[in-house]
Amino acid sequence: MSDGGSPKRMFRGVDHVGIGVGDMDEALAFYGAVGFGDVLFDWTGDVPGTERFTGAGARNARIAMLANGGATPVGPARVKLVQVLDGDGPPPIPEGQAWGELGICEMCLHTRDVWKTHERLAGLPGGRSLMEPLSGAVVPTNVALDISYVSDPWGCKLEMIEWKGLWTSLPGEPRAEGVNHVAFGVKDMKASLDFYRRMGFEERLFESTDFFDPMAPWYDRPIPSQHMVMMMAGQGAAIEPCVLDPLGPDCRGEWGHLGAMEFAVGVTNLERAAAWLSEQGVEVHGQHTVDVGSGEWRYAYLTDPDGLYVSLVEPRY
């Protein structure tokens, strides 16, 4: 393939994070208040590609893609809300999930003024504080940050971060901007980094092997060690794979489960990106085009080293 199809040109970082919710109308109100008030599409139907996760037919769901009007280069990505409508409805958050177990464990929003934004989001109907704001710096880059956590009405962990040593937020009121990164638990850090490096996640912002003590109350078992690495692409949101020791429970859960459950890597051309990854030995499972009214939702699920719910997406909405 020519240089025009090289990973750095075709892949656009994390485009969105998928979050399972129990009631779409309530979720639209909550995330609209968070800052994701631009509804790019709101679609209901059988979701192509999910049949490979169920072993039967595709899941029926209502899906809304939301953008933040205050998105920035360090908070660029979107949120995809998913309400499973068939079967017994939305599957629960995987049992035993604290942070870093195998599966998607959080969505992080870049924020202007973590303290004031934390107070506002924790005070929203259904919102709850999980970690009070604090300041720190990451190693080995020594980039300063403010950080906190809240949860949505269904228990999804929402991290708020302001990378003070990386970016100066634009003027304005305290606010949550777009998605900065998605965090997920893996079994083998090297395998995951090698895999996602093919999609342009090549710049390391930090790497830590120390346990992040403010997370201790989330664990109902002996505290594990944490190996966390944040990798950035040239565009889009970043990824933060984590390996726990011991690994803890499998928290991948069913597709559409409550909380953060999947993410998508943006591409400029779905066919070319899928073909290039296939040449690299990555399993890409079909390519789907869904008419969502405002345009086309074009995507393809792929197999990552840990069987997480990950897709490519070419936004046309």
Language-model segments: residues:
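Short, structured motif recognition centered on aromatic/hydrophobic residues
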Residues: V14, G18-V21, Y31, P76-V82, ...
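Exposed loop/turn and edge beta-strand positions of beta-sandwich/beta-sheet ligand-binding modules
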Residues: G13, R59-N60, G103, A144, ...
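Long, charged/polar, surface-exposed segments that mediate recognition or autoinhibition
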Residues: I93-G100, G256, A264, A273
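Core segments of cupin and vicinal oxygen chelate
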Residues: G20-G75, T141-V143, F184-G236, R272-A273, ...
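Vicinal oxygen chelate
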Residues: S2-M10, F41-W43, K80, C108-R175, ...
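Ordered, small/hydrophobic-rich secondary-structure cores
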Residues: G37-V39, W43-A58, R62-P140
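A short, acidic/glycine-rich surface segment
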Residues: V47-R52, D88-P94, G165-S169, F212-P217, ...
